[in-house]
Curated annotation (Swiss-Prot):
With S4 and S5 plays an important role in translational accuracy. Interacts with and stabilizes bases of the 16S rRNA that are involved in tRNA selection in the A site and with the mRNA backbone. Located at the interface of the 30S and 50S subunits, it traverses the body of the 30S subunit contacting proteins on the other side and probably holding the rRNA structure together. The combined cluster of proteins S8, S12 and S17 appears to hold together the shoulder and platform of the 30S subunit. GO terms for biological process: translation. PANTHER family: 30S RIBOSOMAL PROTEIN S12 FAMILY MEMBER. InterPro entries: NA-bd_OB-fold, Ribosomal_uS12, Ribosomal_uS12_bac. GO terms for molecular function: rRNA binding; structural constituent of ribosome; tRNA binding. Signal peptide: none annotated. This is Small ribosomal subunit protein uS12. Keywords: Methylation, Ribonucleoprotein, Ribosomal protein, RNA-binding, rRNA-binding, tRNA-binding. Belongs to the universal ribosomal protein uS12 family. It comes from the Bacteria. Residues 125-140 have a biased composition (Basic residues). GO terms for cellular component: small ribosomal subunit. Gene3D superfamilies: Nucleic acid-binding proteins (2.40.50.140).
Amino acid sequence: MPTINQLIRNGRSKIAKKSTAPAMQWGYNSLQRKQFASGGSPQKRGVCTRVYTTTPKKPNSALRKVARVRLTNTIEVSSYIPGIGHNLQEHSVVLVRGGRVKDLPGVRYHIVRGALDTQGVQKRMQARSKYGAKRPKKGK
C-alpha cells in the first residue's frame, strides 16, 4: 500500500485498454507498401483464402464454419461465418467485422452476411438483419 507522499510524487498509472479486434486498427498504403495506424474501422473488406470447418472447445461439440480472410490492409485473420449454410469459397470477397466466437480459439472476427459476395441466410424469419435475410413476401 503506497503512502500519500508516494502517491503525490508518482500517482497511479492508467492501464491501457487493448483492442479486441486489432486487425481493424490498421490501414495500408499500397504506394509505399506500408501499414499505418488508421484509428480503426468498423468493418474491412477481404478475400477468403481458405474456407473450412473446425471444432469448438471442450464442453461444446459442432462443426463451426470458419474462413481465413486476407484483409485490404494485408493482415490475414480467421473469421466466423454465422447462420445456417453459406455460399463462400476461396477468392470470395467478404466484409469482416469485429466480434469473437467464445468457443473457437483465435477467431476474433465475424463475416457480415448479405454484403459483397456473401448471401444472406435463406428462409430466415427472425433476427433477419443480423443474417442479411430479405423481408418475406406478404402472401407467403
